[in-house]
Amino acid sequence: MGYTLKLSAGELGRYRLMAEYARDTESTDWAAAGISSGARVADVGCGPGAMLRVLAEIVGPAGAAHGVDQDLDAVAAATGAVAGLGHASAQPGAAAATGLEQGSYDAVMCRHVLGHNGGAELEIVSHLAELSRPGGAVVLVDVDGTATRMHPDDPDLADLTDRYLAFHRARGNHLLAGMQLGWLLEQAGLAVEVFRHIGPLMRIPPGLRPAGWAARDALVVAGFADAADLLRWERAFDRLDRAQPRPWGHVAGFLAIGRRPAP
């Protein structure tokens, strides 16, 4: 599937926020998966590199952090994100055919990719398993896209979410990808060590925009929105930014870790 999220300054900020939240809330899981100083890790579907930078900082110069994304603009952004870190890099490639060396990684991470690749989920996870060394781990993160909530809600922003989900359904994507993670790891021959809900649940900071807004141009091209919708949603975000007290937001995110059998 083509990349649908426009890499604006706001979208890059959203990626950085997600990466820092993940570092704060998933570090114990990462350590259990083998993401630590000196480890070789891969970030498949690395996007603009916010998480790749975090991983590179964790493994340090004694390790390696390699990112892959099919979108050239994302690869360029990721390369910039890890500039100055000689042990980190980003390259173009598909999630199911990365071009990375098989069996060479202590941990392979793939975040928010499977839900955008309906029908190819098992092919992707099987490839991730091949990239991990014997005894290595695959770390998956994805969401239940139907369970995104905000309170107090705004009917216009709820409409944006509904349109974005309809757009994904039309592309054949699986909105419940997060609930598949444990099953996918097992089907790929891995032993599931962790499978849990990770949220987030947080107060929505002013200026934060969801993935649906980043995909607005794609929604228009696909016939799911028009110029009037974009203006209506933009005004709704202006209201959201001024709201006091700040609304609460929840995304039903899931994390799973699968271990490749040791020899």
Write out the residue ranges for each language-model feature.
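Class I SAM-dependent methyltransferase SAM/SAH-binding core
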Residues: 42, 48-98
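A short SAM/SAH-binding and catalytic strip from SAM-dependent methyltransferases
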Residues: 106-120
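Conserved alpha-helix/loop element of class I SAM-dependent methyltransferases that forms part
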Residues: 20-37, 54
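Conserved catalytic/acceptor-binding region of the Class I
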Residues: 139-206, 224
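Helix-to-beta-strand junctions that scaffold the AdoMet/dcAdoMet cofactor pocket
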Residues: 60, 117-118, 132-134
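A short glycine-rich, Lys/Arg-flanked "PGG" loop and its adjoining helix->strand segment in the class I
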Residues: 122-137
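A short acidic, Gly/Pro-enriched loop at the edge of an enzyme's catalytic core
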Residues: 98-108
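C-terminal helical/coil "lid" or tail adjacent to the Rossmann-like core of SAM-dependent
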Residues: 4, 10-11, 22, 193-248
